[in-house]
Amino acid sequence: MKIVLAYSGGLDTTVAIRWLRETFNADVTTVTVDVGQKDDFYQIEKRAYIAGAIKHYTIDAKKDFAERYISYAIKMNGLYEDIYPLSTALARPLIVEKVVEIAKKIGAEAIAHGSTSKGNDQVRFDLAVKALYPEAKIIAPARIWNMTRDKEIEYAKSKGIPIKTESSKYSIDENLWGRSIEGDIISDPSKEVPEDAFEWTKKTKDDKLKISLTFDKGLPVEVNGEKMDLLKVIQVLNELVGSRGFGRVEHLENRVVGFKSREVYEVPAALVLINSHKDLEKSTYTPLEFRFKRSLDGQWSDLVYQGLWFEPLRETIQIAGDNLNKWISGEVFIEVENGNMKILGRKGKFSPFSEEIASYNKGWYPSDEMARGFIEIFGMHSLVARKSRGI
């Protein structure tokens, strides 16, 4: 039997290599997908072979992640429950896509992953595999063996597998779009998140940072007048605004699997870009377009979070989003200081704002007759309803 394992290099998936080999008498091929995590990929490959993999692949998917996935997180203002920029959720379908490519290439009968039975990721991995490689068997060792961390360490030692046991008390998942932090005291939603949990948003600079972001058709193309591709924009902003302490998210999240969980994220570039994009949208769309786009954004975010990337509705929403975003071009001016961001102004290329109409000091004013007629018609629904109800 041939099995392809989505391999992170951590304890769970390292132990899974040997467990899969022995349990299924299988040849295990491992695939690590680089979506921007700060890992030592040489050491990960080395660890995979020592644990028993017959072949290992490291795939650089950072540019792919930015251009095909994060681009839509920006265009669709991807925020689950209006706060979480979907950093972990967004990467999972891409990881599965790359794993499936290898599985099909070598003719693997099964795909394995390290998700547990309590997490959202099992839903995202399983549904993506079913969509892209329905004939493959899905194996999630952590859902089967029910090993604690200590038991996993004991198992690895018994098999002579040198393991990386992180000194950190936190469980970290990291990619280009964000860093999620779980475990230890963070699990208690009544407790303050310790400062040692953070890495990307540790304030190392006290100055007031001003940034201009230029958008073209809904996507950022310049930072402070310097042209760069989307991957570079994200990397630059993560460093610039993260070092000023901006980009932390903490909330009680409604998981796909039926319970609430305290979640903490560091998402500096994501928040700056989404907030700026939303501001430019508001300055450009008609009121009806703006309300419609907000409803699309919410539906898109829910689908991505729930692991339904391959749901046809997601693609339909993106087509509408592309059509609306063709008008989102211009500049947004922001300021970041002491962990806070504020928008200083914006210039939308297609903004219908008219100073002549909006100014109180000059230009157009409706007549008294026009104002009275508008107000009468505008309020008619409410006034007639009150009268019919006797209130």
From Swiss-Prot:
Pathway field:
Amino-acid biosynthesis; L-arginine biosynthesis; L-arginine from L-ornithine and carbamoyl phosphate: step 2/3
Q: Which GO terms describe its molecular function?
A: argininosuccinate synthase activity; ATP binding
Entry's Gene3D superfamilies? Argininosuccinate synthetase, chain A, domain 2, HUPs
| Record EC number | 6.3.4.5
Q: Does the keyword Nucleotide-binding apply?
A: yes
InterPro entries, sorted: Arginosuc_syn_C, Arginosuc_syn_N, Arginosuc_synth, Arginosuc_synth_CS, Arginosuc_synth_type_1_subfam, AS_cat/multimer_dom_body, Rossmann-like_a/b/a_fold
Spell out the disulfide connections: none
Reactions mediated catalytically? L-citrulline + L-aspartate + ATP = 2-(N(omega)-L-arginino)succinate + AMP + diphosphate + H(+)
Q: Which UniProt keywords apply?
A: Amino-acid biosynthesis, Arginine biosynthesis, ATP-binding, Cytoplasm, Ligase, Nucleotide-binding
- Keyword Ligase annotated: yes
GO biological process, alphabetically ordered: argininosuccinate metabolic process; L-arginine biosynthetic process; urea cycle
Q: What is this protein called?
A: Argininosuccinate synthase
Q: Which organism is it from?
A: Sulfolobus acidocaldarius (strain ATCC 33909 / DSM 639 / JCM 8929 / NBRC 15157 / NCIMB 11770)
- Lineage, top ranks: Archaea, Thermoproteota, Thermoprotei, Sulfolobales, Sulfolobaceae
